[in-house]
Regions:
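Carbohydrate-associated surface elements
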Residues: 42, 64
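A conserved mid-protein helix/loop that constitutes part of the nucleotide-sugar donor-binding site
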Residues: 94-109, 120, 220
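Short, structured helix-loop element that forms part of the nucleotide-activated donor/catalytic region
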Residues: 119-147, 235
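Active-site donor-binding acidic/aromatic loop of nucleotide-activated sugar
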Residues: 128-134, 146-156, 162, 212-213
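Acidic donor-binding loop of glycosyltransferase active sites
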Residues: 164-178, 191-192
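Short hydrophobic beta-strand element within catalytic cores of glycosyltransferases
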Residues: 192-195, 205
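Conserved acidic donor-binding segment of nucleotide-sugar-dependent glycosyltransferases
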Residues: 207-208, 212-219, 228-234
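A short, well-ordered alpha-helix in the C-terminal region of glycosyltransferases
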Residues: 221, 228, 235-250, 256-262
Length: 268
């Protein structure tokens, strides 16, 4: 019977309550569900803000990710200069939301000698119909004199080949991201992460241990952390290793399944 069946929602996205329609959707989800399992504290807090009276329905289970398939790395997909520190920003070409613009602003603040020791790969494609965003990004790279240091690579399915060839993963989101899969992938592949203090990102990075967390409105802070990575390549490696340890302990698919089923059993 539908009426006596418990309705449990798994909430992956942050629909900002500042938008009327988003708030209505959040309120309906809270009112008509028995429970909502949220993938991050950021998601949970956003839902709570919509209807605080339903706080008891909200539960936190951090997401996990599986790499059960056989991973075959193809180095031909991305050829890098191994004498440099190679940074990768993997995600849709959405310069404001995904932080490509923030990164370019940060690069303009780097001393020339630091820039010469690094390269930055923007891996991803624009949404169909929004190709102008990539055109504008390319134009900005040219105007800022960064063409030598920044390469845009269209999205590829063999994303593991990108991780195999970069040293640092950049997640400089400027709009709330619930629990970026990119960070989980980065940790799995032993890459340290520099991410912004927004959405679920701070819940995924141990600042100073597995990577760095920077302010989403501070190109200067991002540039300082990039510079630190270039100057301290040994720490880039060690932070990546710590990230893998952290991933195995908290974000593997087995850990996720255990947490998720424990939550479900508690709710039944």
């Amino acid at each position: 019977n539908y009426k006596i069946t418990k309705k449990i929602l798994h909430v992956h996205e942050i629909l900002p309550n500042t938008f009327f329609l988003h708030k209505i959707i959040n309120k309906i989800a809270l009112k008509y569900s028995h429970a909502l399992i949220c993938v991050s504290k950021a998601v949970l807090q956003n839902m709570e803000e919509a209807s605080p009276q339903y706080r008891s329905k909200l539960h936190l289970v951090h997401n996990g990710i599986s790499f059960a398939k056989c991973i075959e790395v193809h180095n031909d997909f991305l050829k890098v200069d191994t004498h440099l520190i190679n940074f990768g920003l993997i995600g849709r070409i959405k310069p404001i939301q995904k932080g490509q613009n923030l990164l370019l602003q940060a690069l303009c603040l780097l001393p020339k000698d630091i820039l010469e020791r690094a390269h930055f790969y923007l891996v991803g494609s624009p949404v169909k119909g929004q190709e102008y965003m990539q055109d504008e990004l390319l134009e900005n790279i040219e105007k800022m004199g960064l063409k030598k240091y920044v390469t845009i690579i269209p999205f590829i399915k063999e994303i593991e080949s990108v991780y195999a060839n970069i040293d640092v993963s950049l997640v400089p989101s400027t709009l709330a991201d619930s629990f970026p899969t990119t960070i989980l992938e980065s940790m799995y592949f032993k890459k340290m992460v520099i991410g912004t203090r927004i959405g679920g990102i701070p819940e995924m990075i141990i600042d100073g241990v597995t990577g760095f967390i920077v302010d989403k409105n501070s190109p200067l802070e991002l540039s300082e952390k990039i510079s630190y990575c270039v100057i301290h390549p040994d720490e880039v490696i060690s932070k990546g290793i710590q990230g893998k340890i952290y991933f195995d302990k908290y974000f593997s698919i087995d850990c996720f399944n255990e947490r998720y089923m424990a939550c479900i059993n508690k709710l039944l």
